[in-house]
């Protein structure tokens, strides 16, 4: 598997002329044909599978209708006047996406909807900007990863920008299990591709700073599969929890705040309350320190129907919650509560309280406890996270700190080379680099470290505007350095 993907990425990097390379990367035609099968033919259904084709068509139609519902669920944020257009495709001559030819909607047998999908009644918002033409001369292709349905690659556009490409993984479990069951590769591709299309629609409809940006998409005929779909999105770094536990509390708090803002947006989205059925960290990425959801094919908008509260049990591995059944026959707030508890068990409990400023711990503990008990909704949770941000950013969390009586000599436009020591958590693995609100906090930190004899205030700031400071064991090697200020502990 790895050998195959490495070869794919190498070919991808060499040219990526869409008419040929996308065929190799994303189409089953890149696989050797079976004995007695022409390279462009689809696998024929085995004995007894004719009835199975009807089941496959039913599943395709079900996913197609889901995509249509999300597409016409009202204008997304910032949407202008709705325009008639093919679902997620701009009209010929439009300002954004370009196709090498007009789209052809094909009607498969057995009652399945055509592919690509037919037009919806309205636009999901301003169209993405990139299309097939943007991918003609990409470079530096790298395989990022794959899941049940999709494979993700990292490429660099001719202008230098790095983006992510998503497509149905022809070696993946989703497509493979479908082909084994129904023996219809094209139909199974359409079934899997509707999940990618659903994600594309939701990325457009749910646009938000903590939702991955959709830059564009491309439909391309491939060997044996017409109109294979590739989406072009913002590129992020995978969420590695072990690495995050070694970062500063300030950066970990930013991730939790990002998540709180995302959940608030999902609870009040233009489509209604959206729940993420798969909430594992791998469904998110980090972009410049901000957490963003990237995988939306398992998102659900509809609340759970019920006839009584007995139907409204929210189940998790460690515990269950009982929610009320509304008079309208829906479990009240189940989508919101599911998101919130998953945020608690996957993120808040690990990232929020540890190594936080002592004066903020009571507030942070209350956030963790309340989300773990589902005592708060997303509105109150976000309000408390924003309060913690205000206290931290304004320096009010320092109101109970006592200023040190130690005196420090100020040496402007200077720095100390070497003489480092390690502390945790630090922004620098080889030294002690921490953020401080002001000079008084820097002195307090130095006084609390037995080995600290000096510190250097840099000209760098964190996302909250706090200064980054190097703490040192001495000042034997003070050198000129414009923009930095060294403070050394006075003798005595």
Swiss-Prot record:
ATP binds at residues 144-152, 166. It holds the Pfam family PIP49_C. Phosphorylated on tyrosines; probably via autophosphorylation. The keyword ATP-binding applies. Disulfide bonds: none annotated. Glycans are attached at residues 137, 320, 369, 400, 459. It comes from the Eukaryota. Induction: Down-regulated by hedgehog (Hh) signaling. This is Extracellular tyrosine-protein kinase PKDCC. It comes from Mus musculus (Mouse). The gene is Pkdcc.
């Amino acid at each position: 598997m790895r050998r195959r993907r490495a070869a794919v990425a190498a070919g991808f990097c060499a040219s990526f002329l869409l008419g040929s390379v996308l065929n190799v990367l994303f189409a089953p035609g890149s696989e050797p044909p079976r004995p007695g099968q022409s390279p462009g033919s689809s696998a024929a259904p085995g004995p007894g599978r004719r009835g199975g084709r009807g089941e496959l068509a039913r599943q395709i139609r079900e996913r197609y209708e889901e995509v249509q519902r999300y597409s016409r669920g009202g204008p997304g944020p910032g949407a202008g006047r709705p325009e008639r257009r093919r679902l997620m495709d701009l009209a010929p001559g439009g300002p954004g996406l370009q196709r090498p030819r007009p789209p052809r909607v094909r009607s498969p047998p057995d009652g399945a909807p055509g592919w690509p999908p037919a037009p919806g009644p309205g636009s999901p918002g301003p169209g993405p900007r990139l299309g097939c033409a943007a991918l003609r001369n990409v470079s530096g292709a790298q395989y990022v990863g794959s899941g049940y349905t999709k494979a993700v690659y990292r490429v660099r556009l001719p202008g230098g920008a790095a983006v992510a490409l998503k497509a149905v993984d022809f070696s993946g479990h989703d497509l493979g299990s479908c082909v084994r069951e129904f023996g219809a590769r094209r139909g199974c591709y359409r079934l899997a591709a509707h999940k990618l299309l659903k994600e594309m629609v939701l990325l457009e409809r749910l646009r938000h700073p903590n939702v991955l940006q959709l830059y564009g998409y491309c439909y391309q005929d491939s060997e044996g599969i017409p109109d294979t779909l590739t989406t072009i999105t913002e590129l992020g770094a995978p969420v590695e929890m072990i690495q995050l536990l070694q970062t500063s509390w300030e950066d970990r708090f930013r991730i939790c705040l990002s998540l709180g803002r995302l959940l608030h947006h999902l609870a009040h989205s233009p489509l209604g309350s959206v729940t993420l059925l798969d909430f594992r960290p791998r469904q998110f990425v980090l972009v410049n320190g901000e957490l963003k959801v990237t995988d939306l094919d398992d998102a659900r908008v509809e609340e759970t129907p019920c006839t009584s509260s007995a139907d409204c049990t929210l189940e998790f591995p460690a515990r269950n919650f009982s929610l009320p059944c509304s008079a309208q026959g829906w479990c009240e707030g189940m989508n919101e509560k599911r998101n919130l508890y998953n945020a608690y068990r996957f993120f808040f409990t690990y990232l929020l309280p540890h190594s936080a400023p002592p004066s903020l711990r009571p507030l942070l503990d209350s956030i963790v406890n309340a989300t773990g008990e589902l005592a708060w909704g997303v509105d109150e949770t976000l309000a408390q996270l924003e309060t913690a941000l205000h206290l931290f950013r304004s320096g009010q969390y320092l109101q109970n700190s006592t200023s040190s009586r130690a005196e420090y000599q100020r040496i402007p436009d200077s720095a100390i080379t070497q003489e480092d020591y390690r502390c945790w958590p630090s922004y620098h693995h080889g030294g002690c680099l921490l953020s401080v609100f002001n000079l008084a906090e820097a002195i307090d930190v130095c006084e609390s470290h037995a080995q600290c004899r000096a510190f250097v205030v840099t000209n760098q700031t964190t996302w909250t505007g706090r200064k980054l400071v190097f703490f040192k064991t001495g000042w034997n090697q003070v050198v000129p350095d414009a923009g930095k200020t060294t403070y050394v502990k006075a003798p005595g």
